[in-house]
Amino acid sequence: MMLRNTRLATSLLRGLTLSILGLALTSPAYAADPVTLTLYNGQHKEVGDNLAAAFEAKTGIHVNVRKGSSNQLASQIMEEGDRSPADVFYAEESPPLNNLGEQGFLAKADDSTLQALPKEYVAANGTWIGVTARTRVVAFNPKLIKEEDLPKSVLDFADPEWQGKVGFVPTSGAFQEQAVAIIKLHGRDAAEEWLTGLRAFGKTYTNNMVALKAVENGEVATVLVNNYYWFALEKEKGKLDSKLHYFTDGDAGGLITVSSAGVIKASKHPKEAQQLLAYMASEEGQRVITNTTAEYPMRKGMVSDRGLKPFEELQAPKITPADLGNAEEALELERDTGLL
């Protein structure tokens, strides 16, 4: 009888021990560490931060955001190689993504993500997506110049008559993309002549917002910028004196460019990284971005609700992000003409 009781007690004790062990192994202390993604963000800081916060709120996946310039971060990814901590790269322009994709640093995006966007705004090999779009414009001050007196083509700003009347940002990725568009449309010589004329007769600024404020304050009559800077300044100051002019007839002055993103091939969390990329292309993710910056959503069927000129009314040149390549030729020309 005593032996039977001893065996029963031993069996109960073993069962209790296994139960406790099972509970311990499923407790938070023994659970797998939660995933944290690293986003290399070349877009504007507020855009990347808001996107990361919204994605974490939806999925529970934390996103560590590292901010830098698009070109700087692309170079860092190439230097880091397989050791890169980056999971997703989000650039303000497409050339850095084009460059990384061509050199094999990006993983192919999920088909469902690619199919949510127009094919002309994703990489041909599927390694990156265009997230949102913006258009090049001329911001002008009506107190200094009438809209009807603006040139018919952005190329005309290189003429002597515009001396001291046009501002631009030679270090801007979008300006460099515009130079590539001129190369594609008119040839290298025309692009070099344009850059040479701007250097001789235009005013250079350190960044686009500084340039735009120069127009707003009457320091210069016109500047070449992206449309969303004007809306950002309007949000900050209220009604503005300056206005936007949109080039037509496929002129390079109305070039459409895109912010872009891709999953890093060396990502330690490829599944979750693809989730973040898909979120950027989703309706919710696109609204988070376009509510932060006045850009056009790229998701099929979506339209801007920020009072922008309708996307379908833009008369942009037929130049795709893929056509812009890595913008190296434009950088060479800027160096040759003394702009960089």
Question: Residue ranges of each PLM-predicted region?
Answer:
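Short amphipathic alpha-helical coupling segments at ligand-binding clamshell hinges
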Residues: 51, 61, 190-194, 259, ...
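Bacterial N-terminal signal peptides
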Residues: 11-26
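An extracytoplasmic/periplasmic, membrane-proximal ligand-sensing/linker region
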Residues: 295-340
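Periplasmic-binding protein-like
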Residues: 162-170, 279-302
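A bilobed periplasmic-binding-protein/Venus flytrap-type ligand-binding module shared by bacterial periplasmic
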Residues: 139-144, 183, 256-269, 288
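A ligand-binding cleft/hinge motif common to bilobed small-molecule-binding domains
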Residues: 95-99, 221-242
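Early extracytoplasmic/lumenal segment of secretory-pathway proteins
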Residues: 31-98, 340
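Extracytoplasmic ligand-binding site segments that recognize negatively charged/polar headgroups
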Residues: 42-46, 68, 72, 84-220, ...
